[in-house]
Regions:
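Non-catalytic propeptide/linker segments at domain boundaries
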Residues: 1-13
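Active-site-proximal helix/loop segments of hydrolytic enzymes
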Residues: 4-6, 32, 36-173
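Short glycine-rich His-centered loop
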Residues: 12-31
């Protein structure tokens, strides 16, 4: 098939999963919550991918999680619903958007985590992020037996977009 040069992702479906949401803020720094930045990055990414022809599905488009209202184990319910949404989406790939945090605030830069089946995708994304953001972080494999990622059936990666613990990077995020 010939790919349209202006719409190279035409016909492709991409799920973007903004991590956390609702009662789960993710990592925090003062009044800055990971969940909010994850959502903002995801919405911006949705716009950019749509411009080149992709059909984009967000797992959430507001400040909420995906757990059942009366779930006893909210986190597991949230994970299970994200897994089902992604697996049933008929997508070509997923991008899970998160932020990093370490007590040592010197660390900065984006880092891609991948499963073996997604190493090529991870390599492309990590190289692109490093070149664009003047970073030298290396991608890492997601540890085996990681609940959510073990259950996903389509290729994809987790992208830690930067460190909320680094003041300069937090301002950029």
């Amino acid at each position: 098939t010939k790919v349209n040069a202006l719409m190279p992702l035409s016909g492709k479906i991409i799920v973007i999963d903004p991590g956390h949401g609702g009662k789960d803020p993710g990592t925090t720094s003062d009044t800055t919550y990971e969940k909010d930045i994850n959502l903002a990055i995801s919405k911006a990414l949705e716009i950019e991918l749509s411009k080149v022809g992709a059909t984009v599905i967000l797992t959430r488009d507001g400040d909420y999680d995906l757990s059942e209202p009366n779930a006893r184990w909210r986190k597991k319910s949230d994970f299970d619903n994200r897994i089902n949404l992604i697996n049933n989406s008929k997508a070509n790939l997923y991008l899970s958007i998160h932020l990093n945090y370490l007590t040592n605030s010197a660390y900065y830069g984006p880092q891609v985590f991948y499963q073996e089946k997604s190493i090529d995708l991870a390599t492309i994304i990590q190289k692109t992020l490093n070149n664009s953001l003047n970073s030298d972080r290396e991608m890492k494999e997601i540890p085996k037996k990681t609940y959510m990622y073990d259950k996903l059936t389509i290729p994809g990666v987790l992208i830690e977009c930067g460190f909320l613990s680094n003041a300069a990077e937090r301002e950029k995020l």
